[in-house]
């Protein structure tokens, strides 16, 4: 048993929940699907789980490396290959006439292309090639903010950051200060590309603190431009900051587990984030259930973290990134194969659903094997070369977590 199997199991559960959530309208009909959503939104529950796990894993990975260069080599080769493969698959199917490019991408091609370079489509205000790309926006912002905190040795104060983001979210924040017009969205997308490139250039030039300043500035974008257009999935700057607070809540759990913050600070921070999530959505009765489900599932997984996890869930966790990105593409193809699936007899819907699940799992496994794993191996080789040359940027070690992480366990991280 690997010490991080419980995190893989959480990712696996989140990934298959998203898949089933998106499939359910086809299987049980829109009315039944919406009836369930009025009580609990399983899609948002799964996304919150993903973010919580990322918040736990990313700082652990960064601090274990002790090098921003190594971290970013690993991150870039972890998230971009499957992302680009998904875009390529969509483009091939669109060229064949089976899929169509989203309207906001056709209307604002320049902004869309630039936004996809940084993965920050949701903050620019254009729809991703695949809509689920929206979550990558907040993953990337989180990576950058954590990078900045680490560069300035401010990374241990996770409880403060989680609570502060949840509280700042309640201020009267603008939703589209930087992206209210097509020209401003195009300019913002270009600035985000330059900001990311500048951050990476400074990191690899050994100027970590300068990189940290640029990286931390990215947190301003969701604070004042969280919902620039109707193409965005996040509905406000308040929601955008709360999603970042959820990721820092994952970091709070990591630091609490390893004695880097006390139980009082950890409990207060987690309570503030939970209250912020529920309070911000007080008109939607599903949100208390969403937050309760995430808390309960996380607590159960954490309680059993030293025990063997179900192999099915850990396997799903390993392929979860590709599964999350690519399952929607197969779902888009269903109407071409069986029109009006939701109106078909029950046996037809069951067979269709099982065939769909088998297909997306096989596709995700292939993507994991032929895209993700080779890229991760390349990342480890490149990182090793940096170490061999003796040029990694020295960073403060906070690795009290070493006994609980094990060697090489971040090779199975996913966002």
Describe the residue ranges of each PLM region.
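Alpha-helical transmembrane segments of multi-pass integral membrane proteins
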Residues: 239-257, 265-373, 392
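Interfacial loop-to-helix transition and helix-capping segments at the boundaries
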Residues: 4-5, 34-47, 126-138, 175-195, ...
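Membrane-proximal cytoplasmic C-terminal regulatory module of class A 7TM GPCRs
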Residues: 334, 374-415
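Membrane-interfacial alpha-helical segments at the cytosolic side of multi-pass membrane proteins
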Residues: 17-22, 54, 58, 88-92, ...
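Structural signal for the C-terminal ends of transmembrane alpha-helices
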Residues: 59-65, 95, 148-157, 198-208, ...
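Transmembrane alpha-helical segments and their boundary/interface "anchor" motifs
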Residues: 44-48, 61-97, 107, 111-115, ...
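Membrane-interface helix-loop-helix regions
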Residues: 79, 83-144, 157, 167-179, ...
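Functionally critical transmembrane alpha-helices in membrane proteins and complexes, commonly lining
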Residues: 5-62, 80-83, 317-320, 324-325, ...
């Amino acid at each position: 048993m690997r010490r991080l199997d419980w995190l893989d199991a959480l990712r696996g559960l989140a990934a298959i929940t998203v898949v089933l959530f998106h499939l359910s309208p086809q299987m049980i009909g829109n009315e039944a699907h919406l009836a369930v959503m009025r009580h609990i939104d399983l899609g948002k529950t799964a996304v919150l789980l993903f973010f919580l796990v990322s918040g736990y894993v990313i700082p652990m990975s960064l601090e274990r490396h002790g090098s921003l260069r190594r971290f970013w080599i690993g991150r870039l080769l972890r998230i971009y290959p499957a992302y680009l493969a998904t875009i390529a698959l969509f483009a091939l199917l669109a060229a064949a006439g089976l899929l169509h490019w989203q309207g906001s991408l056709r209307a604002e091609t320049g902004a869309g292309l630039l936004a996809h370079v940084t993965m920050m489509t949701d903050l620019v205000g254009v729809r991703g090639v695949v809509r689920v790309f929206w979550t990558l926006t907040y993953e990337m912002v989180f990576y950058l903010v954590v990078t900045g905190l680490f560069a300035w040795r401010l990374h241990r104060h996770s409880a403060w950051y989680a609570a502060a983001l949840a509280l700042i979210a309640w201020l009267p924040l603008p939703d589209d200060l930087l992206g209210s017009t097509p020209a401003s969205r195009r300019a913002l997308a270009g600035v985000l590309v330059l900001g990311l490139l500048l951050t990476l250039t400074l990191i690899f030039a050994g100027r970590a603190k300068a990189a940290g300043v640029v990286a931390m500035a990215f947190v301003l974008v969701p604070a004042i431009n969280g919902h620039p257009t109707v193409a965005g999935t996040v509905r406000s700057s308040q929601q955008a900051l709360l999603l970042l607070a959820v990721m820092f809540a994952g970091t709070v759990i990591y630091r609490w587990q390893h004695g880097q913050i006390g139980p009082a600070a950890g409990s207060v921070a987690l309570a503030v984030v939970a209250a912020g999530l529920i309070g911000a959505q007080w008109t939607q009765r599903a949100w208390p259930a969403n937050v309760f489900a995430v808390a309960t599932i996380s607590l159960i997984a954490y309680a059993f973290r030293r025990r063997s996890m179900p192999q099915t869930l850990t396997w799903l966790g390993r392929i979860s990134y590709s599964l999350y990105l690519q399952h929607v593409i197969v779902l888009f193809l269903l109407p071409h194969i069986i029109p009006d699936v939701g109106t078909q007899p029950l046996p037809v819907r069951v067979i269709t659903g099982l065939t769909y699940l088998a297909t997306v799992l096989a596709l995700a496994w292939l993507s994991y094997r032929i895209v993700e794993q080779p890229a991760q191996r390349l990342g480890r080789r490149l990182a090793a070369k940096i170490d061999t040359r003796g040029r990694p940027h020295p960073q403060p070690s906070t690795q009290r977590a070493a006994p609980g992480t094990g060697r090489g366990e971040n090779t199975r991280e996913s966002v």
